[in-house]
Curated annotation (Swiss-Prot):
InterPro entries: DHFR (IPR012259), DHFR-like_dom_sf (IPR024072), DHFR_CS (IPR017925), DHFR_dom (IPR001796). This is Dihydrofolate reductase. Keywords: Acetylation, Cytoplasm, Methotrexate resistance, Mitochondrion, NADP, One-carbon metabolism, Oxidoreductase, RNA-binding. Homodimer. The modification N6-succinyllysine is found at residue 33. Pathway: Cofactor biosynthesis; tetrahydrofolate biosynthesis; 5,6,7,8-tetrahydrofolate from 7,8-dihydrofolate: step 1/1. The gene is Dhfr. It catalyses: (6S)-5,6,7,8-tetrahydrofolate + NADP(+) = 7,8-dihydrofolate + NADPH + H(+). Key enzyme in folate metabolism. Contributes to the de novo mitochondrial thymidylate biosynthesis pathway. Catalyzes an essential reaction for de novo glycine and purine synthesis, and for DNA precursor synthesis. Binds its own mRNA. The keyword Transmembrane helix does not apply.
Amino acid sequence: MVRPLNCIVAVSQNMGIGKNGDLPWPLLRNEFKYFQRMTTTSSVEGKQNLVIMGRKTWFSIPEKNRPLKDRINIVLSRELKEPPQGAHFLAKSLDDALKLIEQPELASKVDMVWVVGGSSVYQEAMNQPGHLRLFVTRIMQEFESDTFFPEIDLEKYKLLPEYPGVLSEIQEEKGIKYKFEVYEKKD
């Protein structure tokens, strides 16, 4: 069974997603809660969601928050020989991680699969065949960044007018406006 893949990301107007291993903007508490709710909430009793992230994204999470709780954490790295402390699994690539998820020990435990960064992992996910959703928080301001989100090809991805559990009106925190968007691609 090929399950849909979900990417979740917050991007500034200049498509920035990171700066010096952190977010380019101040912590937006409600945006962070949205990330937690979306990636944690499982629709299937007894199953957990799974998050996939690159090594740099893993180490950008404060140690006290690793692993992301109530979720199965897979870290991608071609260099590491074993999962970093706290991570549940290590895979060499997104393809390897997706194969791992379909192994019997995990297949029965996993509900939704979320890619949570960084750039190259998002790029790899967006190039996957099949059903893909992008949950994009548009931060409606430019922030200096050194890490960016790949271009969303609107020939392939459709912006959905609404999505269950996702607010459609513009949000504001700390003087920063943002909005939640959901894109979908079906091959």
